Amino acid sequence: MAFVTRCLILAAGRFDPVTLARAALSDREPRLDVFELACALSADVLDFQDVDAARSPLVRATHRALGPSAALALLGAERAARYDAILTTGEDIGIPLAARLRLVRDRPSHTMIAHTLFPVKKRIFFSVGRVDGCIDRFLCYATSEERNLVERLSVPAGRVQRIAYHADQRFFRPFEAPPEPDLICSAGQLLRDYPTLIEAVRGAPIRLRIAAGSPWIAADLKPGTPLPSNVEWGKYSRFDLRALYARSAVCVVPIQENDYQTGISTILEMMAMGKCVIATRTRGQTDTLVDGVNGIYVPPGDPAALRAAIVRALDRPEETARIGAAARRYIEENATLDLFVERVAAATLGSPAKDEAPRLAQ
C-alpha cells in the first residue's frame, strides 16, 4: 500500500470555500491559492474562523493576547500529531508554530512561506529562539529575501527555495477589446507611492484611475491631498478591477523604497492581462520585470522619471503591446497559479520544486 502524506495548511484569513468556489466558477473572482493547494495535497485547512470557533482555553487566551495568527499556530500545534506535513502561509503563523514544535518530540515536517523576515522583531526569533530548527523548508518570492535568509539569518541554502509568486492566469487574461488610449491605472495598498504617481500625471492629458485597496487590509486608504481633475480614486471588486486593467493602455505600480517584494500580486495580475507595467524598482522588487522586455522600471520617488515613462509608453502603442505580450508569456511560463501550486505542493511533500523561478533579472 502506498504511503499517503497527511497534510495540514495553516492559512491567514477567513475563507468561505463554497462562496469562493462559486465566484471562481462564474468568473467573478480568481481562484484562491489556499484551496488549490488543499486540493493538490488533499490537505486539511485551518484559518482564523477555526480560531474563532476553538474551544481550547489556551488558544482563546492566545487569541486575546497575541492575535489570530499566533492562536492559529497554537491550534495547529495542538493537532500536529495527526499530520505528516504542515504548510504555513506566512511567518506570522510559521514562527510561533516553529517555537511550539520545539517542544514536540516526533513532529511533522514544516514548510513556511517567508514574506519578509527583515524586521528585527522577526529576526530575533532566529538569533535567540532558533526557530529555524523547526522549519524544514523556507519558500520565498524575492532574491532579497533569499539572501536575507541565507546570509543574515544563517539558514542553510539547501533549505531555502525561491519560487515565483502567481496570478490566476484563467481569471486575469488578455481581453480582445482595445484599451482606451489615454487611460492608465494603478492598484493596491501596501507601501504604494501614490503621491509620486499623482504628481507625475498632474496637468497631463492622461486619465488615471487608482484602485486603492487590498483583499488583505481592512482599513481604507484615502488620498492625502485633493486630487487633480484627471485622477479618480476608489475601491474596486476583483471583477471590476480586471475590467479596469483591460481598459487601461498602461498599468503603473508606484512603490515606496523597501526590502520586501511589495506590489508583486498587482504586477503579476497586470502582466497576466497582457499589459505593459511600469513599476518602481526597489531593493525588494527586482526579480520579475526585465526593463524594456516584459515591463518598465523607474526609480523610487521620481515623478519626472515616472511621467517620462508613462508618456513614452502611451506614445508608442506598438512597443507597449510588445512588452505586454512578453509579460503574458512570462506569466504562462513562470508564474501561473497552477505552477505555483505545483511548486509549493512539491516542497511541502519534501521534494524540490519542478521549475524554480528563473533568475531573469540577474
Where would I find each of the regions flagged by the language model?
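Acidic anion/phosphate-binding donor-loop and adjacent secondary structure
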Residues: K122-R123, R147-E151, H166-P181, P195, ...
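Conserved donor-binding/catalytic core segment of Leloir-type glycosyltransferases
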Residues: E176-R192, L197-R209
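Nucleotide-activated donor-binding/catalytic signature segment of Leloir-type glycosyltransferases, i.e.
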Residues: A212, A219-Y245
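Acidic donor-binding loop of glycosyltransferase active sites
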Residues: Y245-Y260, K275
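Conserved donor-binding/catalytic loop of nucleotide-activated donor transferases
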Residues: A246-S248, T266-C276, T280-R281, D291, ...
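Nucleotide-sugar-dependent
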Residues: V253-E269, R281-D287
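Conserved acidic donor-binding segment of nucleotide-sugar-dependent glycosyltransferases
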Residues: D291-G292, I296-P303, R312-E318
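A short, well-ordered alpha-helix in the C-terminal region of glycosyltransferases
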Residues: R312, E319-E333, F340-A346
